[in-house]
Amino acid sequence: MRALEESYDVVVVGAGPAGSMSSYNASKNGAKTLLIEKAQEIGTPVRCAEAIPRIESFGINPSSEFIRSYIKGAYLVAPNGKKITVKGGKTDGYVVERKIFDKFLAIRSAKEGTKIAVKSRVTGLEKTEEGYNVFVNHLGKEYTVKTKLVIAADGVESTISEYAGLKSKKNHNEVCSCAEYEMTNVKLLDNNMMEFYFGEICPKGYIWLFPKGDTVNVGIGIIEGSKKAIEYLDDFLSNPLLEGRLKNAVPVEFKVGGDPVGGPIKKTFKDNLIVVGDAAGHVSPLTGGGISLAMDCGLIAGEVCAKSISSKNYSEEFLSQYETRWKEKHYKFLMNDLKYKTILQKLNDNELNAIADSIPENLEEVDVGKLAIKIVKKAPSLLKYFKELI
């Protein structure tokens, strides 16, 4: 049971949502697939805020097994306390227990025939005529696994893509530093609404409060600052904007991590290899959210790899259809969010307040172009930021 076989059609590195969905679709479509996870337990350590849009389109029913809260919208809070309420769209979804959700996705993949190796670290790749030799330390024993295809789903710190000569996001301006408490005894504005706070309290980022059943995820993501992310977060806990709603809060878990918010990497495929999820920059540069996007790109990756196996064509030319397909669905969204993030990072507190005072307090949808016109009409000095959006 512990030993790895000598060869597989597809080796997926990383058992997060991107990796598990990749292996699921590869196995489902007939490829002999190995899913490798460095942690001894899939889903740990948790490094994200755990909010996701609806998942029914993936053929997954929202289950109380992993869903902790249903989300119907969000409050966007300006430095002066002005609240903008947004409902529907991508704010409609869930907060999940990632420890359980990630394991659920891996189990779903295993039921399609995927072999899973936990507490396993890829220590190197060697290109061969047939594909790759993957060097794996599995439960303390060294293995060399032959494979025709590798899917790099090993996260923001991806080493697999770099072993293969594809750049992953590691520039400090492209990775958001995140810290989060899971807390109990928190009073929310609404138990089914997320809260986001912006401004100098969180340089070039935002602070979030996400309902999670009996607890709340209270976190921060910043690009730069004079202090560590955790120091900004600790300062926020007593911020007057909260009106004492966290004064009795008690942390039950602490999480840290990095989020690749610089947009997708330049190229996500080459001969015998595909990059997906955080490793590929499949993350909204604006919000830092990427679970749903990673899942969808993972499905595409798995399907393309299975087709590659059945056609016995593992070339860069054949695998390019993976990038073509995910870009058709998601590239415009990612690049727009990168543009919006760049604008947001230039705004000071007074300018953020001016924006909040220029738009309706209740938004059923977010049309950035229309909002930009409203903002500039009321605050013409902001035209320098929004002229390319109008």
UniProtKB/Swiss-Prot annotation:
Cofactor section: FAD
Cofactor binding mode and count: Binds 1 FAD per subunit.
Positions annotated to bind FAD: A18, E37, C48, A49, A51, R98, V122, D278, G290, I291
Name recorded for this polypeptide: Digeranylgeranylglycerophospholipid reductase
Enzyme Commission numbers on file: 1.3.-.-
Xref: PANTHER family: DIGERANYLGERANYLGLYCEROPHOSPHOLIPID REDUCTASE, GERANYLGERANYL DIPHOSPHATE REDUCTASE
Any coiled-coil regions, as ranges: none
Species assigned in the record: Methanococcus vannielii (strain ATCC 35089 / DSM 1224 / JCM 13029 / OCM 148 / SB)
UniProt-annotated binding residues for a 2,3-bis-O-(geranylgeranyl)-sn-glycerol 1-phospholipid: V368
Keywords attached to this entry: FAD, Flavoprotein, Lipid biosynthesis, Lipid metabolism, Oxidoreductase, Phospholipid biosynthesis, Phospholipid metabolism
Family: Belongs to the geranylgeranyl reductase family. DGGGPL reductase subfamily.
One protein family per Pfam: GGR_cat
GO MF, one example: geranylgeranyl reductase activity
GO BP, one annotated term: glycerophospholipid biosynthetic process
